[in-house]
Amino acid sequence: MSNREAPFLHFYGKHGIIPTHLEVPDIAKFYLIRDRLFETIGVASSLIKGCDILEVGPGSGEKTAHILSKSPKSYTAVEGNPASAMAIKNLLLTFESSVKIFLHEVDFFDFESEAKFDFVIAENVVPFQIEPSEFLLKLINFVRPGGLLIFNCVDGVSMLSESLRRILCRKLNLIDSNLTASAERIADFFSADLDQLPGMSRKKTDWAVDQMIHPFGGKLISISESLKSLMSFARYLGSSPSFYTDWRWYKDTSFLNQDQNQPVIDSFTSLQHNLIDNRETSVARSIIENNTLNEISSKVFELSKVNTWDHALEQQLDVYCKAILQNLSKEQILTRQALNGFCTFLETSDGKDLTAFRNWWGRSMQYVSVVRI
């Protein structure tokens, strides 16, 4: 067994929880949303039929059920959280007559197999690993040439609104040793915020545990960082949100170049500021400006890991927030209003000052698909 720290597995296993459970009142609608997601990242979900699938971290299994409904040839799951493994077992029983199913109850870093797969799917597990790039490289190793890897990215910019909410939890002492009571306090405090979150599909208390209380000992990883890590192993196919437009003719000889990911990286970085707020979208801007924005926002994320909040940390946060305000494009009016309100609240502790902030959510987690080369 690996001696490395496993951020998700340690926290979930310690408390015996699965805070990723999705509330799915309408299965048909949920499956349609999943189909549209796959199409957005360049994959018709019908292509799963007859394929060999590896899923890492299936969690409570709602998304797994969608995959299995597409009739793959085989499905292999790697799940290291005992509570999740128990939940996924019950789901897999309903499909074992039509699909070859294999469940490995281990940490992914301890998983070994000579098999290669048509699809490797790792949703919500790459960001916050101790070394996300290393995790990606192990994932791509299980993809056969021409096969697809589907994963997520979260960077400092997309995470900023939630990093600030994590900081509020610590400043206001909403977290203590009682996990359930802490989650209820946080869910109550941010209830109005969550009511503004499009597509919210899990319990507010589960969100509180997974996003606010979870210590997040690992690192963020952006789309650009992930594509750089995979440069020699995989080629970008698609993403959600979609940001890359390629006007080349299909016979253009540049398609034969080895650095196919570089134009995508440049495009992403020039538009990265749009991840900060799901209510606003503006034109491309300087890569230098966005690198600075991501650097400062990532520092805010690091502050959100601190357990005990004090005046010195608040002063540092104020410096970061003012730098972000200065960095924002003039079109980012709603983001500016929200961040100004947050900064005012730090000074006044008057809940009314958070009014504009409560509507602010970033494009937190992005989906990415790449082709193994």
Q: How would you name each of these model-derived features?
A:
Residues A28-K49:
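Conserved alpha-helix/loop element of class I SAM-dependent methyltransferases that forms part
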Residues S60-S71:
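Conserved SAM-binding loop of SAM-dependent methyltransferases across substrates and taxa
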Residues N81:
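Conserved SAM/SAH-binding beta-strand->alpha-helix loop
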Residues E112-V120:
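A short acidic, Gly/Pro-enriched loop at the edge of an enzyme's catalytic core
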Residues F119-E131:
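A short SAM/SAH-binding and catalytic strip from SAM-dependent methyltransferases
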Residues E134-P145:
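A short glycine-rich, Lys/Arg-flanked "PGG" loop and its adjoining helix->strand segment in the class I
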Residues I150-I186:
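Conserved class I S-adenosyl-L-methionine
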Residues N178-N307:
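Substrate-binding/catalytic lobe of Class I Rossmann-like enzymes that use SAM or dcSAM, i.e.
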